[in-house]
Amino acid sequence: MVISKRAGGRRAAGGAAAQAAPPVNRGIAKADWREGFKKPQAGVSDMTLLTQITNEAVNDNLHKRFSNAEIYTYIGNVLISVNPFRDLGIYTDEILRSYRGKNRLEMPPHVYAIAEGAYYNMLAYKENQCVIISGESGAGKTEAAKRIMQYIAAVSGDTTGTGSTSSGIHTIKDMVLATNPLLESFGCAKTLRNNNSSRHGKYLEIMFDANGSPVGATITNYLLEKARVVGQIRNERNFHIFYQLTKAASPQQRELFGLQGPEAYAYTADSQCLDVPGIDDHADFAAAFEAMRIIGLTDDEQMSMVRMLATILWLGNVHFVENAQGDAELANPDVTAFCAYLLEVDPSAVQRALTQRIMETQRGGRRGSVYEVPLNPTQAAAVRDALSKAIYNNLFDWIVARINRSLQAQSQTAASVIGVLDIYGFEIFENNSFEQLCINYVNEKLQQIFIELTLKKEQEEYAQEQIQWTPIQYFNNKIVCDLIEAKRPPGIFSALNDAVATAHADSSAADNSFMQRTSMLSSNPHFEARGSKFLVRHYAGDVMYNVQGMTEKNKDALLKDILNLVDSSSNAFLIGLFPERPDPNSKKRPPSAGDRIKASANALVDNLMQAQPSYIRTIKPNQNKSPTEYDTQAVLHQIKYLGLRENIRVRRAGFAYRNTFEKIVQRFYLLSRATSYAGDYIWQGDARSGCERIFLDTGIARDEWQLGVTKGFIKNPETLFALETMRDRYWHNMAMRIQRAWRAFMRRREESARRIQRAWRRSREGHEFLELREYGHQLLAGRKERRRFSLISMRRFMGDYLDLNGSSAEGRMLRASANLPPNEPIVFSARAQLLVSRLGRTSIPSPRFLLMSPRAVYILVTHLVNKRPQTTCERVIPLSTIRQVGLSTLRDDWIVLQVGTDEGDPLLHCDFKTEFVAYLLQQTGGRTHVVIAPQLEYVRKGRKKAHVSFRKDESIPVGDVYKSSIVSVGSGEPPTSVSRPPAKKLPRSAQPSTKRRTTSRPVTSRRPVPTVLPTTTASRGLPPAPGGTASASALAVPTTSTVAPASSASGNASGARHVPAPPPVSGGSGLPPYLQAPATSAPSSGMPSYLQRAVPAAPTAPAAPAASAAPTAAQSTSGIPSYLGSSTTKLAPPVTVQQLGSSSTAQTRSVPAPPSASATPAVATPALAPVKAAPLPPPPPTGRRLPRYRALYDFETQEAGELPLRTGDIVELEEKEENGWWLVKKGSTEGWSPADYLELIAEPAAAKPRPPPPAKPASAKPAAAPARVSQSSVTSSWTPPDSHAAPVAVMPGMGDPGGFAAILARKKAERAAAAEQAHVPE
């Protein structure tokens, strides 16, 4: 037994490797079963793929996707969003993360994809970005803007993708997100079309540093609908904050500001809509004040804001009555007094400001005179409402400015900006006034931007760059924008300003003046005057505007009385809301509301034109806010005025990306070897040729790009995304090259170190086991004969041979059977036999499992329970109870453990007895006494003393035999023997053994390998010996070639192959130690049984003929088998079956011959002379076959180590166990199978040898040898025939007496005689 590692180590390692090996997929991803359950896609996700480009086809595609809960659709890089009016669960953090780092084509359409594209382009191209969200009121613009901000806040500043950011960046993100609930509360309201309609425009610019981290933000406010503060139409509401405050104010706020429910105030109750489904005013109020805290508003500022809101609510409850003179009087002075308390002014000042108007004459003799003019109730109510609107409008502006101050305080120098525009959508009501005109005007400007950038500018650029292009017709709404904002000819805003300037005192007169001036606009096809109304044909539809009150709203100037009232207040916050005062000495007309909205819209357009836009076009599916209704006609109208059909046409015919040659080269020069080297720009030509070289080297199809005069164009976004991916991977590839070189260097250095360590460990490997082995020698102290395998150089004390400390199935089973805790180690485990007493009969050894832990010795036994083996713990012997251990003086394997208990002393038979004793003494600290004697005494069960004697019996070659208290055993090695020195290492082969050639060609060797002729015995071969070693006759490799007839070859009439004699070697026996026979003819006592079976007995030599040389006495007693040749012949080393091309029954290992004593003398054998008719020796005995069995039933394995069987399988029996389990072998696989499943197969009787053919005259032509076909299908290797060598039987079974070898000898003699006659002179 040669052991170099702990038992089970290789198996465990192999098992782990096998489990860790990934499946081979050859680049094909495993199919996901969940794909069969995915929701089928409805319509097309990108409408540029529509087969028909019509408004109806676009509408039908949007309808399909809306019905399938897919609200987002692309037109190229434009996102179309249909308001679902419900939560679809598509804005979770998981979905948000899935869009990070993905281009538009990798994921389904989503608002997150637009946000990711804007953020990526900002970082990649260092250009400002903006997201323009347009659509009519209630289409979902505010929600889209919130999701854009949510995504940017989530991904910005986190370059690692782990979500970790610095505290400053995190603060900026929180503040940016906090602006949404705060501005929604103060700037949104319920309308007939939208429950959360934005009643103001907002452009949020988020500033980023060079690393993409947010460093600040700015909000620009556009045209708050302040008229909503003082009045709404039926079923609409005031701004959300009024309902939130009146419903959810704290007790302190209610007590301090007299707050009541919304039904108590005229400004909130007159529209008869206090609650809205889906809106929680209490939760929104808490969110608004939490946003104030995040942004940084102090408690005093928050209380001042609540005071102003309460002032507005109480001002709405001030009513007027007409006195006898027709002037206005206060109907409820108490309310006015409470308003004065809130404004912190004198109550009389409030009364005068609301009921009187101070006028100062500007002309005439009384120039500069001041008059107090009383107001009628209508005029007083207008002054009251003007004060309320002014307070709320200025409060909203203060909130925006306060937010900007908080965000800018954290900002540094911004490198890039992303803007998000959330503005009111296009509105058409029954009564449309000045507010709707301004809102629709801003939407016309946004539509003009869309047309300029996506339709007009793109086509103009193609013409300027001389790009092949087919023009697309579209509607340009510039004519509508000029109708509203132009000065020459004057537009609607200019006409309003002129009317206010000429008739400023009377609003009705100003309205009439305005209608007269609109006659100059009748030449515009998009304008039509109709009495007191006028119609404007907007891009989104025709809108009829009411002129009444429009000039007054356009004037938008506070009375001097109101400003004086504010100045008299002691509230600094209120005074701060009105910082601007008109200059009384200035003759310049103050700007009107129309002027301000026009200036703001043009400034917004300038900002948007300086950034790279991304578009989101929102669509409202129905007017009832239903999640299931889809109004085909209403959506079709929106599709038409949004110009989606024209957008699709331009997108399909245009180019997705264009940029100057310099920027393209700057961006992508890394992708061409001609333009870059190691990251440096090396192109010597101009930018245009460099751009062309990049496109050519990256393999882009020629129809995918064009070069203009100053710019390069890429047609499809897929191409651009591919270039971006290649660029992103460039630095990764460079880094991987450096890493690869570094790893190769480190690997070489580490491998060198490991080689040194390996060499050191190899010299020290198993040192502890060797020391334990030497300790075992010391325990025996030269008093016990040794077995040969106990002394081999590689014999080490491994201990746990059953792998209880490992993970094998058998080890786990034994550990469970012994009830061992998982943390208790096993120092020794092996199979053993226990002497079991039988009533009235002699005791017999019975198989057991022998285990030893640091605290006890365990003896386990296996029984059959219901025809199934079951292992149980038979006995546990604590180490402290073992008084002494008894061993004999001979080489047997018996051990006596004297424990002194009623159960008796166990008498064990174990192959590793010395190792067991060494471990036992090691665990007990040497306290256990070791007795070595020729007769051992032990106690049987019941404290009956017994003896066991040991004697030598040379007829027992291997092992020992117990019978009647006597153990018979052969002679062993001397007691003073020591372990053999380590064997010298064999030189390594030039290539791994797995790569050696295993073909049927001859094996190249310095020494020839004998060629074996096929016979019945040789073709079958011997079964492999236990332990995996093939028998000697298994090396007899059969051949598939038949014997050629005599006429087939001229040089060799018989056609037989000659076996060349091995070259002689001077001195020594010439045999390796593993092939030398012992000096005596008796088998060696130390030879294992499986080696004795592997070497067949030498055949009996017949009487030599007179012509042949007689063998010497030394030859006959050398003990070397005749088939191995003479002792003076140097034999070839063992050859594996793979090298010989053997059949499947042969093993791949070389066959070791029995070792011999070193004292065997070398005997010379003379060469065999050719004879005429030499009688051949009888055939050697056929090698013993293992009995064969047939499986009667199917057997499925339950545990590792069992061999599965199918009915009819043929197996060979290797070992029988008494527990009903047999060790069998099927092919090259062996394992345990139940004996009841097997049936013995009767072997056929051996065929008698064929008699020799009759002798023929010498002159006759020799007959050809009968051809015999080998039973094997494998062609053996062969050596060239030697005409001077005598035919001999090299291996047993290669030739029959008087058979092929006799024919060869006779033919050779005939040829020699014929040659002599030919040379005799006549």
UniProtKB/Swiss-Prot annotation:
Gene: MYO1
Residue ranges of every copy of the IQ domain listed in the record: 732-752, 753-778
Keywords of the record: Actin-binding, ATP-binding, Cytoplasm, Cytoskeleton, Hydrolase, Motor protein, Myosin, Nucleotide-binding, Phosphoprotein, Repeat, SH3 domain
Bias-annotated ranges (Low complexity): 1000-1017, 1027-1056, 1257-1267
Post-translational modification: Phosphorylation of the TEDS site (Ser-369) is required for the polarization of the actin cytoskeleton. Phosphorylation probably activates the myosin-I ATPase activity.
GO biological process: one example: actin cortical patch localization
Record's function text: Type-I myosin implicated in the organization of the actin cytoskeleton. Required for proper actin cytoskeleton polarization. At the cell cortex, assembles in patch-like structures together with proteins from the actin-polymerizing machinery and promotes actin assembly. Functions as actin nucleation-promoting factor (NPF) for the Arp2/3 complex.
A GO CC term attached to the entry: plasma membrane
Name of the protein: Myosin-1
Native source organism of the sequence: Malassezia globosa (strain ATCC MYA-4612 / CBS 7966)
All copies of domain SH3, residue ranges: 1184-1243
